[in-house]
């Protein structure tokens, strides 16, 4: 009787490590190939589009193969891994295939058609003039060191050890010279920065972690909210002692600053591409923590909800839930202009009554919205200096120019009104009874209530105040929900650890008020409850100015513990269940009133 044929080996597994297979960028991708036994690994063949690339792979301690594939042209490529039989009588090999799609390093991946014109700022950022129309510039590597007196200073020669060089001990117990490698360049038309401890003389490698890197990444986001059409010069900041001293690498890009780009879709894309480049340079990060305040918090909330996997945990500060439901911004403009008008003055409003009608603890907060951000709903008011006057919209002299409103940044998602070219707006105050709660409580008179609502007005398509109320474009409302511009909290945010770390500024000097009012933290909490039945994945920290530093340290420390527990949990359950059951038992809402308590 003939011997039975040997059983076929299980097929290898091909995994893109640096990004999702459909979102490869820049012509390279870090790939892992796993086999089910080391015998198969010794007889492995790996190809890209029929080309043998096995030499690009290294065997890792767990028996898998890790390789950085380079030179991919734009478009689709097929990776094939074949575990061949090891000799006569051995089981036949099995083949695995994975298609990857490579995109230009200048983008886009998923954000849609890029804005044009787009004004480059590489020279202003110190990278030299752009090398193409997509605002590219050569990558720069420089070094900084931390002094014993607590500042970062340039280090022209990384082989030199200055007399005032500090050392630092990372969270995994390694003590290293506090030298930082700073990489700056361009990705997705943004200027990016990556900082990490690096006291070695060899370049970083995705195959071996740097001695000072703790294999974690913090991704920072900057605040504001304005129209795009330009590159920007600053990032969310990467030279941060809080992170670097503990061994975290830090990354960010200029399109992760909301004042440069008030679109979390573009921000998410830039973050994904920068993170891909980071992993291909340093290796896979165990997890990535989002960090940043105000508009930076909006980006974290929306990216975590709509693009899960880019950020594993988030630490929003001065937080807001999203930008489109900040209806108080245009409302505060209407109220401020009314109170300063003859009708408002004649109605005799006191400071207390203005606050009561606005719903804020002080009307100063509402007035700050009017002064600082309400212009972002007006196509004529808020153009950044990077956009030349000749390129800006004017209804008569340049009707096809750049409309400098925040709605313009999400026009790809909202669509445009073909009659006038403006993005469909969800802006609406039809039926709003300003000051109703104040009237019901007796804080204002009926005459004041009527005067306010008769004279509040609304906005025309340009964003200028008019006597009539404004009705939302139904298409704009529908698409705001459909495309995730309104943060329900029911998607990826439900399975994201959140530590909301707020410095209390509701009545802060010098204005006696602030736009970053505390209740927005609880708006996020309620949305999580409404969408998921629980908000156990969110913790709220709050501090006064003297306790803010201690609060930030605690937020990072607690987020690290939370993510480490999730990372180690391989028990059954959904992602949301793993987040909640691994929340540290002693982690709860807390406040700080001093650097120590």
Where are these regions (language model features)?
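C-terminal His-loop and adjacent cap/lid subdomain of alpha/beta-hydrolase
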Residues: 9-293, 297-597
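Sec-dependent, cleavable N-terminal signal peptides
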Residues: 1-8
């Amino acid at each position: 009787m003939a011997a039975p044929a040997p059983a076929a080996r299980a097929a290898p597994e091909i995994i893109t490590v640096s990004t999702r297979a459909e979102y490869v960028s820049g012509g390279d991708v870090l790939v892992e190939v796993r086999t089910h036994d080391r015998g198969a690994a010794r007889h492995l063949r790996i190809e890209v589009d029929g080309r043998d690339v096995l030499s690009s792979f290294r065997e890792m301690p767990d028996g898998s193969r890790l390789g950085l594939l380079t030179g991919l042209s734009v478009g689709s490529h097929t990776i094939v891994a074949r575990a061949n039989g090891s000799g006569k009588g051995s089981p036949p090999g099995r083949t695995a295939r994975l298609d990857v799609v490579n995109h230009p390093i200048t983008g886009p991946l998923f954000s849609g058609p890029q804005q044009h014109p787009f004004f480059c700022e590489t020279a202003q950022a110190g990278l030299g003039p752009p090398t193409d129309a997509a605002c590219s510039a050569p990558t720069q590597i420089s070094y900084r060191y931390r002094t014993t007196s607590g500042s970062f200073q340039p280090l022209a020669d990384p082989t030199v050890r200055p007399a005032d060089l500090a050392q630092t001990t990372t969270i995994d117990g390694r003590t290293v010279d506090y030298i930082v490698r700073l990489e700056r360049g361009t990705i997705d038309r943004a200027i990016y920065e990556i900082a990490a401890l690096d006291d070695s003389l060899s370049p970083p490698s995705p195959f071996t972690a740097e001695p000072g890197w703790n294999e974690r990444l913090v991704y920072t986001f900057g605040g504001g909210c304005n129209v795009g059409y330009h590159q920007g010069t600053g990032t969310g900041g990467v030279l941060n002692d809080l992170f670097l001293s503990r061994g975290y690498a830090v990354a960010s890009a200029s399109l992760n600053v909301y004042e440069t780009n008030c679109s979390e879709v573009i921000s998410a894309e830039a973050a994904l591409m920068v993170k891909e480049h980071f992993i291909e340079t340093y290796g896979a990060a165990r997890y990535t923590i989002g960090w940043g305040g105000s508009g930076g918090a909006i980006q974290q909330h929306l990216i975590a909800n709509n693009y899960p996997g880019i950020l594993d945990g988030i630490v929003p500060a001065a937080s807001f839930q999203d930008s489109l439901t900040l209806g108080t911004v245009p409302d505060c403009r209407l109220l401020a202009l009314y109170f300063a008008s003859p009708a408002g003055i004649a109605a005799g409003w006191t400071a207390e009554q203005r606050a009561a009608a606005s719903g804020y603890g002080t009307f100063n907060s509402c007035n700050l919205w009017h002064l600082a951000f309400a212009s972002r709903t007006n196509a004529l008011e808020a153009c950044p200096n990077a956009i030349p006057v000749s390129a800006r919209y004017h209804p008569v002299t340049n009707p096809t120019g750049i409309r400098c409103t925040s709605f313009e940044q999400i026009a790809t998602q909202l669509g445009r009104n073909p009659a006038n070219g403006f993005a469909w707006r969800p802006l609406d105050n039809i039926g709003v009874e300003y000051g109703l709660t104040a009237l019901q409580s007796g804080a204002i008179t009926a005459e004041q209530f009527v005067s306010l609502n008769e004279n509040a007005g609304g906005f025309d398509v340009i964003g200028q105040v008019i006597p009539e109320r404004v009705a939302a474009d139904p298409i704009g409302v529908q698409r705001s929900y459909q495309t995730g511009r309104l943060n329900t909290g029911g998607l990826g945010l439900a399975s994201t650890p959140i530590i909301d770390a707020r410095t209390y500024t509701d009545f802060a000097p010098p204005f006696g008020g602030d736009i970053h009012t505390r209740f927005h933290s609880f708006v996020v909490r309620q949305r999580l409850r409404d969408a998921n039945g629980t908000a156990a994945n969110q913790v709220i920290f709050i501090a006064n100015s003297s306790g803010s530093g201690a609060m930030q340290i605690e937020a990072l420390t607690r987020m690290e513990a939370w993510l480490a527990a999730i990372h180690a949990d391989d028990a059954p359950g959904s992602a949301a269940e793993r987040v909640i059951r691994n929340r540290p038992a002693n982690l709860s809402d807390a406040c700080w009133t001093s650097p120590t308590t």
